[in-house]
Regions:
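Short S/T/G/P-rich N-terminal loop/turn motif that feeds into the first structured element of a domain
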Residues: 1-83
Length: 83
């Protein structure tokens, strides 16, 4: 069964290109350690909720976007040795 590490972060909108470049470097490294897939998803239609939402979860400022990413590993043992 696959094992997933998930991440939710706030990234300054003005730093999007730098984030993408950094994420690409990280992705290549983590794949060498056994990850099957790495995804970064830049939010473009994430509404603000009434009680809670992704924006509040990361305390995103008005100039920041929410990024949801995950690493898929073949199993927990590979993840533990890769991290």
């Amino acid at each position: 069964m696959s094992y997933i590490d998930g991440f939710l972060i706030a990234v300054p909108v003005a730093q999007r290109d730098a984030f993408i470049q950094h994420a690409g470097t990280f992705d290549a490294i983590i794949l060498e350690y056994g990850a099957v897939r790495v995804m970064e998803c830049w939010a473009d239609d994430v509404p603000h909720g009434k009680l809670t939402d992704f924006h509040r979860a990361v305390q995103a400022r008005d100039d920041e976007a929410v990024v949801f990413s995950w690493i898929e590993w073949p199993d927990k043992a590979t993840r533990d040795s890769g991290m």
